């Protein structure tokens, strides 16, 4: 009830029903990757762009209280008032390993080892910065629901695709899909099994794709190299220089560090 999703009687607040559905759907994806998380030590999860932290609190309750994991979750957001309120609620509930910090994703250096990185509607290139951090930390799992993929909309330079680029809504949707496709291929390049899945029905949010990446230690070099070549060729064809490429693809080796 403190988060404004449920009433005192345990009913979902009507105006928050879409958010309630999104959080529950995200927890289903978390449940799917539980075999990738260790149970013999503390598990660290980063929630970048946590906002009011509906998902962050739900994950902590689900993993610690219901599944019995020794869990540490860190929520990061730029909004000082939001972080202050979330920190207050964590203390109120006795969640001593649920911590919140104010700051940007690209500048956050508060941990050295992370098991899972999640983002739910981290806007535009914030998803790329979160992905880069996850790779640098060696996260076993990445779950990301991107939004507001505007970057490539300003970059596309392939004149032969005018049947798409001449129409704003088609151009916008194509560039959003291209952004997430490049991200997925970069994760494959770094040794992850990667899927792009439908997050939730469009009626609840138009931002309905989830990138799920699970690291595999025995990923073949050939597969990684193929993914890297596909990224290069695709970006060259359309004149793209996305943050995911400049920040990750060009600065990390093909083998995950």
Show where each model-derived region lies.
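Conserved class I S-adenosyl-L-methionine
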Residues: 42-51
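Conserved small/polar residues in nucleotide/adenosyl-binding loops
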Residues: 248-254
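Conserved SAM-binding loop of SAM-dependent methyltransferases across substrates and taxa
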Residues: 52-67
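S-adenosyl-L-methionine
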Residues: 84-112
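Conserved SAM-binding motif I beta-strand of class I
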Residues: 72-77
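Substrate-binding/catalytic lobe of Class I Rossmann-like enzymes that use SAM or dcSAM, i.e.
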Residues: 147-233
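Conserved Class I S-adenosyl-L-methionine-dependent methyltransferase catalytic core
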Residues: 1-40
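S-adenosylmethionine
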Residues: 101-168, 196-201
